[in-house]
Swiss-Prot record:
NCBIfam families for the chain: rplX_bact
Matches recorded under Gene3D superfamilies: 2.30.30.30
Alphabetical UniProt keywords: Ribonucleoprotein, Ribosomal protein, RNA-binding, rRNA-binding
Family per similarity comment: Belongs to the universal ribosomal protein uL24 family.
Name the record gives this protein: Large ribosomal subunit protein uL24
Length: 104
């Protein structure tokens, strides 16, 4: 089955502590989760690595978020949108359901 959300897609969080925030998808995990830039930040403890001259302490990084908690952002309408699939010139492409615009 083709993925409705892919890397580099612009998405909006629709539920949770980061509701309403927008970001780009950095990674899509096979477990039904995605990592989005600047969304769902968590603080991790990091040990110092003297060989690499890395200090220890707290590091903020993005944690995975369920794909059901995000929606694709349609720049043409300025809102979230649903995704459909269709064939154009023998290739399967994604499109926005509200205005039928093809997604890059």
């Amino acid at each position: 089955m083709a993925a409705k959300i892919r890397r580099e897609d612009e998405v909006i969080v629709i539920t949770g502590k980061d509701k309403g925030k927008r970001g780009k998808v950095k990674n899509v995990l096979s477990s039904g989760k995605v990592i989005v830039e600047g969304i769902n930040l968590v603080k991790k403890h990091q040990k110092p690595v003297p060989a690499l001259n890395q200090p220890g302490g707290f590091v903020e990084k993005e944690a995975a978020i369920q794909v059901s908690n995000i929606a694709l952002f349609n720049a043409a309408t300025g809102k979230t949108d649903r995704v459909g699939f269709r064939f154009e010139d023998g290739k399967k492409v994604r499109f926005f359901k509200s205005n039928s615009g093809t997604i890059k």
